[in-house]
A protein has these predicted regions:
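A conserved, hydrophobic alpha-helical segment in the catalytic core
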Residues: 114, 218-231, 270-273, 306-349, ...
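Extended acidic/charged loop-beta regions that coordinate divalent cations
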Residues: 39-63, 84, 94-100, 185-187, ...
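Walker A (P-loop) phosphate-binding motif
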Residues: 133-180, 467, 472
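Flexible active-site lid/hinge loop adjacent to a nucleotide/diphosphate
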Residues: 181, 186-275, 313, 391-410
Length: 472
């Protein structure tokens, strides 16, 4: 009976555990950190076995209650388990461990025991990933058109998304969503017949030193765009100098025929001493390619010469900055200006990046994918223009822990000046922000919980930096 209870509890626990592991991007360390923060779950499991030994079959009732509770916890997860091929392979590896666990009745240690099959799974997945990476590298070598690599501490996905629209005439293939790792880019290249495309636009992300070098060594772009540098992922990079070195490594392998496109509105890039042999093009308010934002139009200049203008449909400096790499390449590719103007005036934003949704007489600004101060302040400025009750839902920021006090001083100041109410999603790092908020505010467990509290009666709601369950 004890082994049966153990098996049932293990099976009911499994969806929750595997989902958290998936949200941790299959990193065992992040997975363990989550459950160490939520260790009360394991204590409940232990309680079942203590009651069993004391009262025998009466523990079935308690086991049933725990089972229901575990399934309830899974139902409360905002991001549910996605049954990918990797997850299916993982479940196959887990089968013998479930049997061993039920036989030995060690559910109390189940979370930690699962690290063994996770480790085995990761070894297998590395072999599989290496196979598909080699396949993608071969396809890249056979591709005879431009490969554009986009990196930076922020705005990579938006810049890529804008660029693919501006350059539509040359039929580019852009990696979808935020696919910016070796596996993500390999998946995109392997899923498409590259003979139908005349350019590749590859977003290249980096959370650790040498991530960019691995990407450029595999897909060797001949055009590199750096959107900006800031204190992101400081927990892994340690200091801003390492971030600059990492991001700028994208231009190291370009060669004499390569093109490096840098955002000179960014202080770190503007002050960077470039000693490479590639052709350098800067963009910004005062750069090789510059812009002038007027009330009705945006003027574009190349080396102080007027190029064209397009209608300003509510664009601000960050929007135009994110458009500039696409505009530069459009000019270099000699795309018809009228076509570029039409696309710029009708450009679409990527999902969850300041998308505006209307619900009755209320609006929601969905900026849930943003995770940096600059973008958050921009979204607050957008919120300011609505003559409605202004509400922000935010957890703050989940990285740059050393800089959080300074970041939150600036963030809270604008929230207090602009908003009428703030819902703070409770994280381990959110108390600093919570204490700095002077307007009416309250804690919530998730963005979804805050949504349920909205009246949608003449409200303007900003959802800023939603986070997965792994951070909660």
């Amino acid at each position: 009976m004890l082994s049966f209870i153990s098996l049932v509890l293990s099976l009911s626990y499994l969806p929750l555990i595997i989902t958290i592991y998936q949200q941790a991007h299959y990193h065992i360390k992040e997975y363990l950190n989550y459950f160490i923060r939520h260790f009360y779950l394991e204590l409940l499991i232990l309680m079942v076995y203590l009651i069993y030994f004391i009262s025998g079959y009466n523990s079935l009732i308690m086991a049933f209650l725990i089972l229901v509770y575990l399934l309830y916890l899974y139902s409360k997860l905002r991001i549910k388990l996605k049954f990918t091929k990797r997850i299916i392979r993982l479940f196959i590896i887990l089968i013998p461990f479930l049997y061993i666990n039920s036989y030995l009745c060690i559910s109390y240690l189940f979370i930690f025991i699962l690290c063994i099959p996770f480790f085995i799974s990761n070894l297998i997945e590395r072999k599989i990933s290496h196979y598909y990476l080699k396949k993608a590298i071969l396809k890249r070598k056979e591709f005879n058109h431009d490969v554009i690599g986009i990196t930076g501490s922020f705005a990579k996905t938006t810049t890529k998304y804008f660029m693919s629209q501006i350059l539509d005439d040359i039929t580019p293939l852009a990696t979808k969503a935020s696919y910016n790792t070796l596996n993500g880019i390999s998946l995109e290249l392997n899923n498409h017949n590259l003979k139908y495309y005349n350019a590749l636009i590859l977003e290249m992300g980096s959370n650790h030193i040498n991530d960019i070098k691995k990407l450029t060594s595999a897909f060797f772009p001949n055009i590199a765009v750096v959107t900006g540098i800031g204190p992101m992922h400081l927990d892994s990079f340690k200091n801003i100098s390492n971030i600059i070195k990492e991001k700028m490594s994208i231009i190291d392998g370009l060669g004499e025929k390569g093109i490096a496109i840098l955002n000179y509105d960014n202080e770190y890039l503007r002050n960077y001493s470039y000693n490479g042999t590639s052709y350098l093009i800067s963009y910004g308010k005062n750069a090789d390619f510059s812009y002038q934002i007027l009330e009705d139009y945006v003027n574009i200049y190349a080396y102080n010469e007027f190029v064209f203008k397009f209608k300003n449909n509510g664009y601000d400096e960050i929007d135009i900055s994110n458009m500039m790499p696409g505009i530069i390449l459009g000019v270099l590719y000699k795309i018809d200006y009228n076509q570029m103007i039409f696309r710029l005036e009708n450009i679409k934003r990527p999902a969850s990046r300041q998308r505006i949704l209307e619900i009755g007489n209320s609006i929601i600004i969905d900026d849930s994918f943003n995770s940096n101060l600059k973008g958050a302040l921009k979204a607050l400025e957008q919120l300011k223009h609505y003559n409605k009750k202004k509400i922000i839902i935010t957890p703050g920021f989940v990285e740059c822990k050393k800089l959080l006090p300074n970041l939150y001083l600036k963030y809270a100041k604008r929230i207090n000046e602009i908003c009428d109410y703030a819902y703070i999603v409770k994280l381990s790092t959110s108390k600093i922000l919570y204490d700095l908020i002077k307007i009416n505010h309250s804690y919530v467990r998730s963005v979804d919980e805050a949504r349920l509290m909205l009246s949608f009666n003449n409200e303007a709601v900003l959802i800023e930096n939603d986070v997965p369950d792994i951070y909660l």
